[in-house]
Amino acid sequence: MLELNGVPVDDTYCEAFDGIYSRIIVTAKHKWLLKKAAYSATALPSTVFGEAEGGVEKWLSPQETPDGRLGAICQIWVQKSKKFLDVLMREMGKRIRQGILVVPTTRVFNATESETKFDAEINVGRCGDGYEWEDEMWGRKVIRVPIMFGEFIIERYIGYAEGIAGGNIWYFCESEEAALEAGEAAVEALKQLDGVITSFDICSAGSKPETKYPEMGPSTNHYFCPTLKGKIPDSKVPDGVKSIPEIVINGIKREVVEKAMFVCMDVVSKIDGVVRISAGNYEGKLGQHKIYLKDLIEKYS
């Protein structure tokens, strides 16, 4: 069996898939307002229901933002499909209007390096009810939307591009405390990488493709539920394991997802109580991209 820092690693792969993302910079006058907007806009991962998921890639200093204020890079993702642009427009509009615009002093700027863009006048600016106007500020073409607090400013053209979603690792732990410590350290370490998000941070409920109740969406991966060990004949939970979290990673290209997966593996392997590392493998039923853990260890360790 493979090992990393003395922790066994399954010789397996994760299944990732193509997705469409938009990367934006959110700024605000105060840190607490920025956090409220960034977390609101990226909350509730729901691509499995034909909607969107997101995450905060990193926090920015005033020296790193277009308007010289505190900021955050956020990513919003939708599934790649024939009508992805319709879904992206709907979901970006919803998350910006209801997650960011309603938070005082916020502004939104494009951070996607892409030739493909959508017009934010259509799905955000028009909530100004025709009283919004176009301007040029900070060297960018923006829409200024009058609101009761003052105004909301958004860059008019927001980019989108194709990336890789669903990269993941699982880590098997002797306790919930070890699982939380390892997961928090891994998610924090990824803030040092450009281009990746963890839409669930520490995901407590890994799922499986098949289900008894399709109307519910993804169901619990019962094979790996510690509380079912001894209750079902096909449990795959090792002796002594009490928690098996998952960290799901989306990135702007495959290389950054691979690097992020290895960083997570390396970080969690150094935490006491982590006894095994694996990944979500569904025999090709979920994603078209296979990222082998063995290859990551050989490439990055």
Curated annotation (Swiss-Prot):
Family per UniProt?
Belongs to the FTR family.
Q: What is this protein called?
A: Formylmethanofuran--tetrahydromethanopterin formyltransferase-like protein
Q: Which domain of life does the UniProt lineage start with?
A: Archaea
Molecular function via GO: formylmethanofuran-tetrahydromethanopterin N-formyltransferase activity
The UniProt entry, under Pfam families, shows: FTR (PF01913), FTR_C (PF02741)
Q: Sorted alphabetically, which keywords does the UniProt record give? A: Transferase
Q: Which InterPro entries match?
A: ForMFR_H4MPT_ForTrfase (IPR014053), ForMFR_H4MPT_ForTrfase_C (IPR002770), ForMFR_H4MPT_ForTrfase_fd-like (IPR023447), ForMFR_H4MPT_ForTrfase_N (IPR022667)
Tell me the organism's taxonomic lineage. Archaea, Methanobacteriati, Methanobacteriota, Archaeoglobi, Archaeoglobales
UniProt record, GO biological process: one-carbon metabolic process
